[in-house]
Amino acid sequence: AAIFFAGTPILESAMVYPLAICGACILTSIAGTFFVKLGTNNSIMGALYKGLIATGVFSVAGLAVATYATVGWGTIGTVAGMEITGTNLFFCGLVGLVVTALIVVITEYYTGTNKRPVNSIAQASVTGHGTNVIQGLAVSLESTALPAIVIVGGIIGTYQLGGLFGTGIAVTAMLGLAGMIVALDAFGPVTDNAGGIAEMAGLDPDVRKRPTRWM
């Protein structure tokens, strides 16, 4: 999107800005790992969420530093009649971080074993395979609505703030949290594999249930 600033004095800054955001977010992701600690309930997912929250907070600060150091807070140019300011681009980055947080919350709601969607599928399974498939399909279709609305809202909001370049900055900020997000995504398959190995090895039933309790 920086090509919109071709031939202007801020072209280099516009190209460096997304790279600066990524660099800052790499550092914030590393810093966030130091906050991954078990609480009194021994919930590993809770510990991972602590790291994600810390990373998000640090990323806001990193985004502010990257914005100030590369493009500043004032007007940096005009694209298609739209005035682009560093402040607006900073808010675009914040929108990207908020969208990421909302998607994590929505995902937790639709996949958590103690939440309504999963419990409704389990309840439907009592009456047979058919109702299980029907309810599972219904929940899966329902679960795509909120993420789509959040993403569309983020696109519209960032475009109003900073045009296509602003949308690109929001996406860059989202990708900056990829380190902690991948850690969250990877934990599920690891615990599933641990439980499967325990079951195939004929270990005590409590050993099989333990990975599930970690979630």
Swiss-Prot record:
The entry's keywords: Cell inner membrane, Cell membrane, Hydrogen ion transport, Ion transport, Magnesium, Membrane, Translocase, Transmembrane, Transmembrane helix, Transport
EC number: 7.1.3.1
Cofactor: Mg(2+)
Recorded GO MF terms: diphosphate hydrolysis-driven proton transmembrane transporter activity; inorganic diphosphate phosphatase activity
Keyword check for Membrane: yes
InterPro entries reported in the protein's UniProt record: PPase-energised_H-pump (IPR004131)
Main location: membrane
Protein role: Proton pump that utilizes the energy of pyrophosphate hydrolysis as the driving force for proton movement across the membrane. Generates a proton motive force.
Assigned protein family: Belongs to the H(+)-translocating pyrophosphatase (TC 3.A.10) family.
Protein name, per record: Pyrophosphate-energized proton pump 2
Provenance organism: Rhizobium leguminosarum bv. trifolii
